[in-house]
């Protein structure tokens, strides 16, 4: 008979996978309608011209063009998509 009780398995050793958040299309990259530009929690980046925001704060393109980041009032960062014809 064993004189020492068997050790139980550890209760730790699990972790959830990352949420794959962040910038997916960077400044001056070409996008088409529906392309995801940024996945985020909350509004670190705000939607600007020609972009939309999903209910999970994902920013996506509404038109074909190029991604542009700019600072607005109160140092907020806005994401725009500039039309191909307006970029020279």
Curated annotation (Swiss-Prot):
Pfam family, one: Ribosomal_L27
Listed Gene3D superfamilies: 2.40.50.100
An example Gene Ontology molecular-function term: structural constituent of ribosome
GO BP annotations, alphabetical order: translation
Listed name of the protein: Large ribosomal subunit protein bL27
The keyword Transport appears for this protein: no
Keyword terms of this UniProt record: Ribonucleoprotein, Ribosomal protein
Disulfide partners: none
Gene Ontology CC: ribonucleoprotein complex; ribosome
InterPro entries reported in the protein's UniProt record: Ribosomal_bL27, Ribosomal_bL27_CS
Coiled coil: none
Lineage: Bacteria, Pseudomonadati, Pseudomonadota, Alphaproteobacteria, Rickettsiales
The keyword Ribosomal protein belongs to this UniProt entry's keyword annotation: yes
Organism annotation: Ehrlichia canis (strain Jake)
Cross-referenced NCBIfam families: L27 (TIGR00062)
Region (Disordered): 1-24
Signal peptide (UniProt feature, chain positions): none
Annotated family: Belongs to the bacterial ribosomal protein bL27 family.
